Each structure stands twice: as structure tokens, then as C-alpha cells.
Amino acid sequence: MKLWDILATCLLLLSSVSTRPLFHKLQPSKRAVVRSESPALDPIIDSQPETSNPKQASMEEQYDLTGLYPEQFEDVMDFIEATLGRLRRSSDVEPQMKRDRVRQKAAANTEKSGGRGRGERKRSRGRARSRDDRVKGQGRGCLLKEIHLNVTDLDLGYRTKEELIFRYCSGPCHDAETNYDKILNNLTHNKKLDKDTPSRTCCRPIAFDDDISFLDDSLEYHTLKKHSAKKCACV
């Protein structure tokens, strides 16, 4: 579109030059000759040249105009050639700029896709490690488990249809036993200690869930505290 706009402008300039009146550039000597010679003619003969003088003047003006056109045409043609040269250079530069922009976009997309790929690989490795940790945790003994129950199933004397998730600690603590626990177990087994000796290390909660409140069948509110385990350990 830029090329056609500039060409249209050049054509308008060319047409304006071709139709522009150039009477102010006419040579005054020819008009002076016509005026100086006309009074010397005979009155009888003078009537006819008066009718032919406008034609003769117009032919002279036309002759002068055609003499002036080549210089103006040369200026306009020089302007058009210079404009076309600039357009050719700009048309050669624009495809190169477009190719550079395409390369830059492709490189940016490659970097983004590479970054996403690295992030996905890191996340997959993290998920794999978490699965391994869960598998290893299952073999360590003391674990946090959960079960879905009704509040009435807790046998705390409440009659309600409310439900909750009960979490509890379960599993052996052989790996967590110290020499103290081993000695205590051996002495108890050999009956060298009384039966009221504290029991061995067991899996118990070391943190509890938040308190819960519920409405029983008698429309009374109750609150349970330290009812469910949140974190377990061998103690």
C-alpha cells in the first residue's frame, strides 16, 4: 500500500505540472514586437490581423510552454526515480526484518518450551521422590492412618448423625527403640521387674487435629478436643 500511495502522489504532481498555467514565464520580447508592429499597419489590413493575433499569440504561448515542459518533466522524473529507489531499498530491508523477527520469536518459543520441559521433569522427579518416601514410610512402622466414622461410633455417649474423619497412629516402633527400651524389655521378660513397669515404646500422636463442634439429636452443641491425631511418632 505504501508503494501505491507514493506512485499516486507522483502522478498527481505530474498532472498538476502539465495543466499548470505558465503565462508568467512567457518571453516579453515577443509580445512587445507584436504590439510595436500592429500600429504601423493599414486600417484596412489591421482588421484582419486583429482576428488572427489571438491565434498567433496562443500558438506562441504554446510554443513557449512546450519549450518549458522538458525541464519540469525532468525534475518530476528525477523525483519519481529517487522515490522508486527508496521504495526498492525499503522493500529489500523489510523482508530481512521480518525474517529476523520470525527467528527471534522461534528462539523465544524454543526457550519457553525448554523451560516448561525442565519444570515438568523437576515436578515428575519430585512426585517420584514423594512416592518413594511414602513407600519407605510404610516400612518404618509408625504411620498416620484415617477412617470415616459417625460420631455415634466413637462411643462417647453422643447420639447424632454427624460424621467425621478419624485419624489415628498405628505401627511398630522397633527402629525407634533405644538401649533403654531394650534393657527394660529384657528385664520385664526375665521377670526381674514388677509388672507395673512402663510399657515399651509405642506409636502415638504428638499433635492433634483442630476441635470440631456438632449438633446431636437433642439439638445440643458439643465440642470434641484432641479427638483425632495429626502427627505420629514413637514415644
Swiss-Prot record:
Propeptide positions: 20-87
Main location: secreted
Subcellular location, record wording: Secreted
Region (Disordered): 34-60, 91-137
Gene Ontology MF terms in the entry: glial cell-derived neurotrophic factor receptor binding; growth factor activity; MAP kinase kinase kinase activity; protein homodimerization activity; receptor tyrosine kinase binding
Bridged cysteine pairs (disulfide): C142-C203, C169-C232, C173-C234
One GO cellular component, as annotated: extracellular space
InterPro entries recorded: Cystine-knot_cytokine (IPR029034), GDNF (IPR016649), GDNF_fam (IPR043401), GDNF_TGF-b-like (IPR047020), TGF-b_C (IPR001839)
Positions glycosylated per UniProt: N150, N186
Keyword Endoplasmic reticulum: no
Swiss-Prot/TrEMBL GO biological process terms: branching involved in ureteric bud morphogenesis; diencephalon development; enteric nervous system development; glial cell-derived neurotrophic factor receptor signaling pathway; metanephros development; mRNA stabilization; negative regulation of neuron apoptotic process; neural crest cell migration
Assembly and interaction partners: Homodimer; disulfide-linked. Interacts with GFRA1 coreceptor and RET: forms a 2:2:2 ternary complex composed of GDNF ligand, GFRA1 and RET receptor.
Family that this chain belongs to: Belongs to the TGF-beta family. GDNF subfamily.
Record's function text: Neurotrophic factor that enhances survival and morphological differentiation of dopaminergic neurons and increases their high-affinity dopamine uptake. Acts by binding to its coreceptor, GFRA1, leading to autophosphorylation and activation of the RET receptor.
Matching PANTHER family: GDNF SUBFAMILY OF TGF-BETA FAMILY, GLIAL CELL LINE-DERIVED NEUROTROPHIC FACTOR
Name by which UniProt lists this protein: Glial cell line-derived neurotrophic factor
Species, as recorded: Danio rerio (Zebrafish)
